[in-house]
From Swiss-Prot:
The chain crosses the membrane at residues 162-182. Keywords: Endoplasmic reticulum, Membrane, Signal, Transmembrane, Transmembrane helix. This is Increased recombination centers protein 22-1. It is a single-pass type I membrane protein. It comes from Candida tropicalis (strain ATCC MYA-3404 / T1). Residues 183-234 are cytoplasmic. The keyword Transmembrane applies. Is probably involved in a pathway contributing to genomic integrity. The lineage of its organism: Eukaryota, Fungi, Dikarya, Ascomycota, Saccharomycotina.
């Protein structure tokens, strides 16, 4: 098998696989491919893989060649589909593998890194493996894996959250300052109590004011004629 020919063909296939969907006349091959998730090896195809946005997950493939001639694993890709409508949501990045030669009756292993960057929702993952066999590049679909993608929780000490908190504090502080300068200061001036100076204790009465006589009462308001009568009697 000429690997230069295989690689040339693989390059052409990868260039047209961005919107990959199986088409054309199917070819029957006796090649078995299965995979597991490295981070959660206990999950089966009937389980749901819980993935977090922004994380990376590793798919560990096992390829068994039951053909009479050798094969070569040359690439891998995949799709996330809506599990209800079966519509394609996004394609995985197509990557080159090896080529890894697999003799008849033997098996090999290889890995694929999956970067999760999806809307939080439920999906079904369908990987596809490119295999060179009889000078042809054949695309072999793998089993589906249900996945539930959730957004990562943000820690209180996350630098992004701390930066957001600082921006909010500065914004509210500036707003409070301008409100005080425009309305608060004038309002406080208008409602402040006015201080009245207290009269000093022990102050003397003005000379122009009324004065008490020895009799103990103020005579300034008594008519003069009445005062004269009182003086005569005395």
């Amino acid at each position: 098998m000429k690997f230069s020919t295989i690689l040339t063909a693989l390059t052409a296939v990868i260039a047209t696989v961005a919107g990959y969907e199986t088409s054309g006349k199917p070819h029957t091959v006796d090649i078995l491919i299965d995979y597991s998730i490295k981070e959660t090896p206990e999950l089966s195809q009937n389980d749901v893989a819980n993935w977090v946005n922004g994380d990376k997950y590793t798919l560990e493939y096992v390829v068994s060649n039951n053909e009479e001639t050798e094969i070569a694993v040359v690439g891998v890709t995949g799709q996330f589909k809506n599990p209800v409508t079966n519509q394609i949501v996004t394609n995985l990045t197509t990557g080159q593998v090896g080529p890894i030669t697999v003799a008849p009756g033997e098996s090999i292993k290889f890995e694929q890194i999956v970067d999760v960057d999806l809307m939080a929702n439920n999906y079904e993952l369908f990987p596809y493996v490119f295999v060179a066999h009889d000078d042809l590049i054949k695309v072999i679909p793998c089993r589906g894996q249900l996945t539930s993608v959730v957004d990562a929780t943000i820690s209180f000490f996350d630098p992004r959250l701390i930066l957001l908190e600082l921006v909010l504090l500065v914004t509210f502080g500036a707003a409070a300052y301008f409100i005080y300068e425009i309305w608060g200061k004038q309002y406080l001036k208008g409602t402040a109590p006015v201080k009245v100076p207290a009269r000093k204790s022990g102050s003397t009465v003005s000379k122009k004011g009324a004065s008490a006589t020895a009799s103990g009462f103020d005579e300034s308001w008594i008519p003069e004629a009445h005062l004269k009568k009182n003086k005569k009697k005395a």
